[in-house]
Amino acid sequence: QSAARATETRTLVQQLLPGFAGAAVLDADGLNAAAQLLAEDKPFPHPAGELVVTPHPGEMARLTGLSAAALATDREGIALRYAKAWNAVVVLKGARTVVASPDGRVCVNPTGNPGLARGGSGDVLAGMLAALLACGLPAYEAAACAVYLHGAAADRAAAKRGEYGMLPHDILPELGALFAENQR
C-alpha cells in the first residue's frame, strides 16, 4: 500500500467509522490504520453499531504490540482480552480461528485448512461476515457463522482441488450448498 493510500485509509477509518450508525467489519488495511491510531494513543475507531475486527496473527501483533510467540501461547485469552478492550467481536484468524465477544463468549472454529492462508481468502470471509451483519445477525453470531461456513466451504474445496491447489474463488461455489444444508 502506498503512503498516500495508507493516509487515505487511515482518514476514512478515523473519521468515517465513528459516525457510521450500523455494524461494521474492519479488515486488512482498515486494521493497519487502526494499529497506527492505537500506536499514537488514539482510541480504537468504533461505529455506533457493532464492530467486528478480523486480524490474522501479524495484524493482531501490530494492533496489540504483542509478539507472534506471545499470541500463539493463548489465542483464546488474547482474543477475549482485546474483544473487551475494543468493545468489538474479534475474529483472530489462523489454524482454528478464534471468535471472541466483549460479553465473554468465545468459540474456536473446527473447520478450515491451510489453503485459507492464500491471499484473498480473508476477503471472502470479510464479505460473508458483512453480508450476515446486513441480514441482521448480531455480530458474534454472524462472525461465528461466517467463520464456520468459510472453513467448511474451504474444506470442501480442498477435497476437490487440494489444500494448496484451491484458490479463494473455489470457496464460493461450496457456500450455496452449505447454506442450503444449514438452513432452518
Identify the residue ranges that each predicted region occupies.
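Short glycine- and Lys/Arg-enriched binding-loop motifs that mark or flank ligand-binding interfaces
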Residues: 26, 90, 108-111, 115-119, ...
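Feature representing long, continuous alpha-helical segments
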Residues: 77-80, 107, 126-127, 140, ...
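Short, small-residue alpha-helix embedded
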Residues: 61-62, 118-149
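Charged C-terminal helix
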Residues: 152-184
